[in-house]
Amino acid sequence: MKQYLDLMQKVLTEGTPKNDRTGTGTISIFGHQMRFNLQEGFPLVTTKRCHLRSIIHELLWFLQGDTNIAYLHENNVTIWDEWADENGDLGPVYGKQWRSWPAPDGRHIDQITTVMNQLKNDPDSRRIIVSAWNVGELDKMALAPCHAFFQFYVADGKLSCQLYQRSCDVFLGLPFNIASYALLVHMVAQQCDLQVGDFVWTGGDTHLYSNHLEQTNLQLSREPRPLPKLVIKRKPASIFDYRFEDFEIEGYDPHPGIKAPVAI
């Protein structure tokens, strides 16, 4: 994951101090891209331990169209707790937009089912896109989508994906985002009988919070280790039928975890 460490160093070196919604303060750059060849290993950061259970359960939760944290709590995942209301609701966040985008005529559009059909029936389409950025519902969301828009691309029997992330917490959030979308590419590729290609990450406001700088320097002092391998144990009937037990990571040997506060 040299690309990730290079980005951290770039933000430290070239970033501009900025205020932010949380009041914490950041140093920020605008516009950065990383490319991960998924044939070369699963892009899970090795310079600190990442909580893979949370990454997998969150993605499965998104794919179910769920926007209440009850499922996450049942599986000991707390990453959305700070934004949920007293009933555990988050408003029409990612899962709602992915699976039930409201159309003006009263229909609800299942974007995930749509892209699965496109990949199987029209893989050369340039419109194989999922958006979570629903302008009409942003004010109802507990948190506006950070990873807002992604596009699939098929060439030579390989599935690639590019994500646009409008706001990126480089230290805490980005390792989750990279692994989550890499996992999604593997799942979609398997369902469509494709090989995995590249995951391309594109960031807008790409920042380190001012209270993450010590942790960032510690992480930069560590040598990256070989990437692990993702094993998917079965092929379910649909993209929506995966379970946590279907996934195994082999050869993950990270450095110890590094704690840092979440900016809310």
Swiss-Prot record:
Keywords: Cytoplasm, Methyltransferase, Nucleotide biosynthesis, Transferase. Its EC number is 2.1.1.45. It catalyses: dUMP + (6R)-5,10-methylene-5,6,7,8-tetrahydrofolate = 7,8-dihydrofolate + dTMP. One of its GO terms (molecular function) is thymidylate synthase activity. The keyword Cytoplasm applies. GO terms for biological process: dTMP biosynthetic process; dTTP biosynthetic process; methylation. Its main location: cytoplasm. The active site is at residue 146. Pfam families: Thymidylat_synt. InterPro entries: Thymidate_synth/dCMP_Mease, Thymidate_synth/dCMP_Mease_dom, Thymidate_synth/dCMP_Mease_sf, Thymidylate_synthase, Thymidylate_synthase_AS. One of its GO terms (cellular component) is cytosol. Coiled coil: none annotated. DUMP binds at residues 21, 126-127, 166-169, 177, 207-209. It is found in: Cytoplasm. Catalyzes the reductive methylation of 2'-deoxyuridine-5'-monophosphate (dUMP) to 2'-deoxythymidine-5'-monophosphate (dTMP) while utilizing 5,10-methylenetetrahydrofolate (mTHF) as the methyl donor and reductant in the reaction, yielding dihydrofolate (DHF) as a by-product. This enzymatic reaction provides an intracellular de novo source of dTMP, an essential precursor for DNA biosynthesis. Homodimer. This is Thymidylate synthase. It comes from Klebsiella pneumoniae subsp. pneumoniae (strain ATCC 700721 / MGH 78578). The gene is thyA.
